[in-house]
Amino acid sequence: EMTSSLVGSEMCIRDSYRTDNHGKGSWYSINGNIDYQRTSRKNKERMITLSYKINSQPQTNDSYNTYLDIEPDENKLDIIKELSLKNFHSDGKTNTMEQTFQVDYTTPIGKLHTIETGAKYIFRRNSSDNRFYEAEGASENYAYNENRSSEYRHLNHILSAYAGYTLKYKGFTFKPGLRYEQTIQEVKYLVGPGENFDSNFSDLVPSVSLGIKLGKTQNLRGGYNMRIWRPGIWNLNPYFDDQNPMFISQGNPDLKSEKSHAFDVAYSSFSAKFNVNVSLRHSFNNNGIERISRLITAEDGEDFGGGHIAPHGALYSTYDNIGKNRNTGLSLYLNWNASPKTRIYVNGRGSYTDMKSEAQGLHNYGWNGSFYGGIQHTLPLKLRLSLNGGGSTPYISLQGKGSGYQYYGLS
């Protein structure tokens, strides 16, 4: 509860009122899963696994904001009108429900080969119903306000299937794989701003890895993988938001999934005295989702269809797959057990980043590095003394550089 007062020019209280906020809400999480696995009697490494999982998170929120004791009483109606004092009541319900069905099958072929395959289906439903009611200050005659209310349904159908093959021969391992993913989205806005739309994404995601044992304590591995990021609802929604007619925004339902490609090579060596891991990684993305803005220069404005016209001089913003990003990095981890009671460790990383946004006319690149390390020593009575420190150079962003840091500690 809060009290507000308005002071006049003669430093006396002109009017005052109290604000009362109260409400109640609930939050639940419901989880469950069932798994079934069957192993072949002839070969224990041949198996099939069936899985089902469900998760639901219903929430409710019922809140009131009320103006009380509006004084002076003889000016109550004028005060309510001048200060736009409106009691409001918000009654909201949301729920996220997800069900996952999955099957996995693994079988060896001879002594050297293994095949893995499987499929997964995810059904995800997000729903929200938030009703907003208003009344003039000091009144309880609440009226439904559709403009400030919202109700929507987001349905996601995610289907994926994968196949993988593994070859193991002495110290050599070769493992290629391929995954197919399809996402179907259905978005409906029953109340409030927003435009109904559907989207469909289909992606093939390959991967491959190689591993070689160089003796009993050394390994060399390399590989390639691709990761995908799908655009969010706000990126896709074609709703023409011209609440401010000079600053217009609209999603792009034709966006594609972002695809990031990564190659890496790593060497590791482990022994009682030394542990070493060195890795080199290069990644790039040629279709990053970027927000693009442009001025409407046509004297008569620009027609975007559906009766939507952006006036001359307005700033129109949407999204497109035009971002580019490249990064090459080298990392090192070293652990040396100098004595039974002393351990020295070092962890460092250096990378070169190149980022470009054609829509914004921005291009930035540069080096970045980070390091931390320390010494640990065990004292008598099993007390442990630790000295550590580290730092980082400024990181590279599209519009400049961030801040670096350094630290040290003794414990």
Language model features with spans:
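Single conserved hydrophobic/aromatic residue that forms the stacking wall/gate
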Residues: 2-8, 12-13
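Extracellular loop and loop/strand-boundary signature of outer-membrane beta-barrel proteins
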Residues: 15-22, 35-37, 84-91, 144-151, ...
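Face-selective signature of the C-terminal outer-membrane beta-barrel domain
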Residues: 21-188, 277-278, 326-351
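Outer-membrane beta-barrel proteins
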Residues: 25, 43-45, 58-63, 126-130, ...
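Residues that define the transmembrane beta-barrel architecture of outer-membrane proteins
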Residues: 26-30, 95-99, 155-159, 200-204, ...
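Structural signature of Gram-negative outer-membrane beta-barrels, strongest in the C-terminal barrel
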Residues: 92-102, 106-127, 144-275, 279-285, ...
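Outer membrane beta-barrel strand-and-loop segments of large Gram-negative receptors
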Residues: 98-102, 143-150, 250-252, 256, ...
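Conserved C-terminal beta-signal and adjacent last beta-strands/turns
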Residues: 364-411
